[in-house]
């Protein structure tokens, strides 16, 4: 189920949204710009450390963050469906970005929950089940959403999808919090130091690539 609710939001802001904007006669150049709303999926590493550092509810570290992201995700999907692209495209962009942000956040926590709640021998099966559910979720939002939109309105389709996402909330409430001991990290240890290490490694790798490239270009060739 967690894989399903992870895959479902993805195509709501890609395939289904593009079809909706096209039907509303939004220009192709504007629709192309909407590809930028997918950035949170690529940049989610920026706020992922916060989910390890802070506990926000009695549900526990993982379930607390998961429930919060799911509630905001469902709300974003619902209100996106109530927006009107032909009148206020800005609202559509903001709500679409909210969907991708909270969807990416949900993915972070679900991945951590899966790794911590399964034994080492169960990780492969767990990952396979997650991917299978993810594909079914994407199929439901993509093909299923387009079929429903052809019969009903896009607003109703997004409302239906937001209601389906409640399955994730129910699963979160019924699931058990992983029994994992967490070391308490400072803000510097959990966020600043990883970034510092990342950019240090990136700089070193980049320097090595430049050095190798320079050496390769300046080596004499034998004729």
Predicted features and spans:
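Hydrophobic core of transmembrane alpha-helices in multi-pass small-molecule transporters
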Residues: 89-106
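Central cavity-lining transmembrane alpha-helices of secondary-active solute carriers
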Residues: 33-53
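Conserved small/polar residues in nucleotide/adenosyl-binding loops
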Residues: 215-221
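Glycine-rich segments within core transmembrane alpha-helices of 12-TM secondary carriers
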Residues: 128-142
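Helix-loop boundary and gating motifs at the non-cytosolic
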Residues: 1-37
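Symmetry-related core transmembrane helices of the 12-TM Major Facilitator Superfamily/SLC fold
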Residues: 158-173
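C-terminal ends and interior cores of transmembrane alpha-helices
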Residues: 71-85
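Juxtamembrane intracellular "pre-TM" segments in multi-pass secondary transporters
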Residues: 181-211
């Amino acid at each position: 189920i967690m894989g399903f609710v992870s895959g479902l939001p993805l195509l709501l802001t890609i395939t289904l949204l593009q079809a909706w904007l096209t039907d509303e006669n939004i220009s192709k150049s504007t629709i192309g710009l909407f590809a930028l709303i997918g950035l949170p999926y690529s940049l989610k590493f920026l706020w992922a450390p916060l989910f390890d550092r802070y506990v926000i509810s009695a549900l526990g570290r993982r379930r607390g963050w998961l429930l919060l992201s799911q509630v905001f995700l469902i709300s974003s999907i619902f209100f996106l469906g109530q927006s009107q692209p032909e009148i206020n495209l800005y609202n559509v962009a903001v709500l679409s970005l909210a969907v991708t942000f909270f969807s990416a956040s949900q993915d972070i926590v679900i991945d951590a929950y899966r790794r911590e709640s399964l034994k080492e021998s169960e990780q492969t099966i767990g990952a396979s089940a997650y991917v299978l559910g993810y594909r079914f979720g994407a199929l439901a939002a993509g093909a299923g959403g387009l079929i429903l939109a052809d019969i009903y309105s896009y607003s109703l389709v997004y409302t239906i999808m937001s209601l389906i996402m409640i399955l994730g909330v129910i699963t979160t409430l019924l699931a058990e919090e992983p029994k994992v001991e967490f070391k308490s990290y400072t803000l510097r240890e959990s966020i600043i130091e990883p970034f510092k290490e990342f950019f240090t490694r990136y700089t070193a790798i980049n320097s090595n690539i430049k050095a190798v490239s320079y050496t390769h270009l300046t080596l004499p060739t034998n004729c």
